[in-house]
Amino acid sequence: MNLNINMHISWLGGTTVKIVAKPFDEEVVIVIDPYKPAEGTAPRSLSPQVALFTRGSGDSITLSGEPFILDTPGECDIKGVLITSVAGTEGQTMIRLDAEGVSLAHLGLVNKSLNQKQREVLSDVDVLFVPVGGVNTYDAEDAVKAVNELEARVIIPIAHQSD
């Protein structure tokens, strides 16, 4: 099988992730959790076509243009990117993206075990963003449990303390 993958993934701090995919002829910029950090620096503004939030869309950094915003559970297809958002804990959501033959899951801020519905939607992904080592995040043992449950191929830690 010949895969031509043009996806770029950037961690911007906290739980913020920028994904640039090219499922068809046009790039799609997706930003997950573009929140203003309590401390440290973050981009002043971003220009995504899609902005996804795991904890509601309040307290966001400036988003230029008119991005499609999803901050509740649901499913949609935007420019060839399939987005599935499932209810998390305490009003939060968890997100799965499928584009260019690559699947990604973002757990947001979570420190509880995953339920059956979450495991169904988020399992067997290529890339998993796991919150670990920060406030309201998994400790190492629980992060390993979540990773093993979801059987991801690549793990990217997020929400950890960084300089």
Map each language-model feature to its residues.
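Proline-aspartate-enriched helix->loop->beta-strand connector
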Residues: 48, 127, 143-160
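Short Gly/Pro-enriched loop/turn and capping motifs at secondary-structure junctions
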Residues: 134-137, 160-163
